[in-house]
Amino acid sequence: MSYSLGITLTFELLKFKTEYVNRVYVHSAMKQGDTLDKLLKLCKDSDIEVVYVDKIFNVLSQKENCYVIGEFRKFESKLDKESSHIVLVNPSNAGNMGTIMRSALGFGMNRMAIIRPAVDAFDPKVVRASMGAIFSTEFVYFDSFDEYMKEYGDRELYPFMLDAKMKLHDVSPRDKFSLIFGNEATGLPHEFSNIGQSVIIPHSARIDSLNLPIAASIAMYEATKADF
């Protein structure tokens, strides 16, 4: 079970994953008006229960202006073998994962492989940070990178590493590809330098590295800019 915290996220949930919605909670402080009327109509049309209760908001949300919560069942996805992927190896931060999902949807790369151990994509913090992009993202968990490779390895592979020799602006993916990123704290293990073509995003010496969502977003932009 998971939750969409806030009316904007809940509208996205109702739009893209209606069949997985159990119920919608509405706080007593939610103002009457067109927005609430629209929400109630969507729920009625899809036969979704609306529950007026305040207590659950105290448990699930620390934001004072959260007046709508959608409760939904976890859903399964499949990765398209003919599409390009984002691969996150051992991501541990919920906010980062959600932010990457949002960028991936924006750049048309909303297919994500997640290598365990990893944060739960259905953590409400991921859902919130994704701004609803999770409901339009294909994502699959794998117990190891080798498991991912066995099923989806027939593609161009680009692990992003600080000791890589090739700079991002010199990379020109020609076919389906995977952009591979490591854990926020440790990056990718050294053995990934032997997989595909390792890549570095050049930046000034004033910083040690870019944070994960920024690096992933820059990489996705460069890889897909010809499409827009």
Question: What does each model-identified segment do?
Answer:
Residues M1-I69:
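N-terminal positively charged helical leader segments and presequences
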Residues L36-L39, V119-V126, T186-E191:
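Short, glycine/polar-rich helix-capping loops at beta-to-alpha or helix-loop-helix junctions
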Residues N22, V26, E76-A164:
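RNA substrate-binding interface of SAM-dependent RNA methyltransferases
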Residues G6, S92-I100, L210-A215:
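Amphipathic alpha-helical repeat scaffolds
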Residues Y67-S77:
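Short, structured interface segments
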Residues N22, G70, L105-F107, A121-F135, ...:
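Structured adenosyl-cofactor binding patch, chiefly the S-adenosyl-L-methionine
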